[in-house]
Regions:
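Core catalytic alpha/beta fold that binds nucleotide/phospho-ligands
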Residues: 9-151
Length: 151
């Protein structure tokens, strides 16, 4: 079969397509320096209230576990805006991309504001997120899936 003139290879009722992929890697030492230097001000700028309350221990004197927690979630935010194709621009800020943990512990992305608007405009229906960290780095991969709009 041939592709339709608009280039959309997904006929009606077909499976969703990958709309965007984002990857980000953060050095834990850089995140630790930011947390020590800017503390609560930094956390308030990059995380929603419920994200901050999920940080293990005392954010004022972050443990290695807290640093990796924050770094992985900030990497998720960066990966998400890369997948959207915007970066932190077009009115999208770090608080517009939240990372929540399901009861199973699996992380999920929740978009709001301009990030949600951009995702809707792109036809995003499903967001996939995976986080990982080593002794030195935290990383996140985001895949956006959906039905791209017809042009």
């Amino acid at each position: 079969t041939s592709a339709p003139a608009d280039g959309n290879l997904l006929p009606e009722g077909a499976h969703m397509a990958i709309i965007g992929i984002g990857l980000d890697l953060i050095e834990l030492s850089r995140m630790e320096r930011s947390l020590h230097r800017f503390g609560e001000h930094f956390l308030n700028r990059i995380m929603a209230d419920d994200e901050r309350s999920a940080i293990p221990g005392d954010p004022a004197s972050p443990s290695a576990r807290a640093v990796s927690h924050v770094a992985a979630r900030f990497a998720a935010k960066e990966a998400a805006v890369k997948a959207l194709g915007t970066g932190f621009a077009e009115g999208i800020g770090p608080r517009d991309v939240a990372v929540r943990s399901l009861p199973s512990g699996k992380p999920e992305l929740v978009l709001s504001g301009k990030a949600r608007e951009k995702a809707d405009a792109l036809g995003v229906k499903k967001l996939h997120l995976t986080l990982t960290h080593t002794r030195d780095n935290a990383a996140a991969v985001v895949i956006l899936e959906g039905y791209p709009p017809h042009h």
